[in-house]
A protein has these predicted regions:
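Small/polar beta-strand repeat architecture
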Residues: 5-21, 97, 101-120, 156-176, ...
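Elongated alpha-helical scaffolds
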Residues: 79, 83, 110-139, 357
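Hydrophobic residues embedded in beta-strands of well-ordered beta-sheets
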Residues: 88, 138, 148-149, 180-181, ...
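N-terminal beta-propeller domains
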Residues: 1-102, 140-179, 327-406
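Residue-level detector of short, conserved catalytic/binding motifs and their immediate flanks
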Residues: 66, 79, 86, 127-128, ...
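Short, glycine-/Ser/Thr-/acidic-enriched flexible segments
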Residues: 136, 219, 230, 364-365
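Short loop/turn segments that connect beta-strands within the blades of beta-propeller domains
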Residues: 84-86, 125, 132-135, 207-210, ...
Length: 406
């Protein structure tokens, strides 16, 4: 009986599992092979031998594990990073990047020990590469020139945060800006009821609409934090009031004919037509010269009493055409703690998705994906706008950590 041999014309199916031996009923059976070693498969089906390698340089410590990571800015500027025990070195164009006289290898110190290398994951945008590890803060590698490289912690703006507080525990800030002391009424709701710990240092905290980074822990209910730029720990006004109907007059305070209901704005730039919460203060400020010598009364509302401040019948001059209302620093139960910390873990996966820097796979939220503000990779300000940061938790019958993002 004649023997028929099939002509294999392409190998786009790659190596086939031994479990597919004899499965000639599958289309891919005729596009694969049992073993394809040291070959490169072309998109159009053919295969050629892989290119050879050559010795460029010895790694820093040959006895320890080393990991090679590509860093490609474009098709003409491509590097290889040699990650080793607490360092990385750089290679380009078949050689090691060096500097100085005599020349020495450019080396950057890292916090990644040999045991950490296998768990590192990377996402690159132009000259910046983000590096994640489940037990370490997110860092970024930046290239500023051929021989100038840095690796620094990522300074996230306004998040991401855990779910908002739902307990009766309140936080009170001792000041509005700069370095502030924040005191909790109880440990309930903070790190599972254990309160603040030293693992919270470097963690973000959101108090109402202010944001700060924890710099020290005094006790389980007391921390020191630095308010982030352009943020203040002000209590936002609500459009309600407890005093009798209040009007705002602009012009000569002695002339009642000028009284009307002009609106004012609170510290969050929200318009408030009239009324306050308890114990709110009005602060007048201005710059330049007033064309009509406009005057404003500075008043304080306490429950149902309208008082002039600092004393009766005091009129303060101001060239400002707006009034800023700043709430008193009071205990507030509207707070949240940062999602990335030694206490909660750090993301183990990273990628870019639709102009957003995306993280996933923390120890406390293994199935949650964190998306940055669109086009602003290190900004995680949540909101309702189309470009606001997003936090999304996958729903499934098993809770398994997200291992990979693409």
């Amino acid at each position: 009986m004649a023997r028929a041999n099939f002509a294999f014309t392409n190998f786009t199916a790659g190596e086939l599992s031994p479990r597919l031996n004899g499965r000639s009923d599958l289309a891919k059976y005729f596009n694969g092979c049992e073993t394809l070693e040291n070959f490169l498969i072309h998109p159009h089906g053919g295969a050629t031998r892989r290119p050879g390698t050559r010795f460029v340089a010895e790694v820093k410590t040959s006895s320890l594990q080393t990991r090679l990571v590509p860093f490609q800015f474009n098709v003409t500027q491509a590097y290889v990073l040699e990650f080793g025990n607490n360092y990385f070195r750089i290679y380009k164009d078949g050689g090691q990047v060096t500097s100085g006289s005599p020349a020495s290898a450019v080396e950057v110190t890292t916090t990644y020990a040999t045991a950490d290398l296998a768990a590192l994951k990377f996402a690159q945008s132009a000259d910046v590469m983000y590096v994640v590890h489940p037990d370490k803060p997110v860092r970024k590698i930046a290239r500023t020139s051929h021989t100038a490289w840095t690796i620094t912690d990522v300074d996230f703006a306004r998040g991401p945060f855990l779910d908002p507080n739902t307990t009766a525990t309140t936080l009170t800030s001792g000041a509005r800006t700069g370095s502030v002391t924040i005191t909790a009424s109880a440990a309930t709701g903070i790190n599972g009821g254990s309160g603040f710990t030293t693992d919270d240092i470097g963690r973000l905290v959101k108090l109402h609409h202010g944001y700060a980074e924890i710099t020290a822990v005094g006790s389980t209910t007391s921390i020191t934090a630095t308010v982030q730029d352009n943020d203040v720990f002000d209590t936002e006004l609500e459009p309600s009031y407890t005093a009798s109907t209040i009007s705002f007059a602009e012009g000569d305070p002695s002339s009642t004919s000028l009284e009307h209901n002009d609106r004012i704005i609170d510290s969050a730039k929200n318009w408030v037509k009239q009324g306050f919460l308890d114990n709110m203060e009005i602060t007048v400020s201005g710059a330049g010269t007033s064309a009509n010598n406009t005057s404003y009364l500075i008043v304080k509302v306490t429950d149902d009493t309208l008082l002039l401040a600092p004393s009766d019948d005091v009129v303060n001059e101001s060239a400002s055409s707006s009034i800023t209302v700043v709430g008193k620093l009071v205990a507030d139960d509207e707070w949240a703690l940062g999602a990335f910390s030694p206490e909660t873990g750090y993301p183990s996966s990273v990628t870019f998705y639709e102009q957003r820097l995306t993280f996933a796979g923390t120890a406390s939220q293994p199935q949650t994906v964190f998306f940055s503000v669109s086009g602003d990779f290190e900004n995680f300000t949540a909101g309702t706008e189309d470009d606001s940061a997003l936090i999304y938790t996958l729903g499934s019958n098993q809770v398994n950590v997200i291992r990979y993002l693409s």
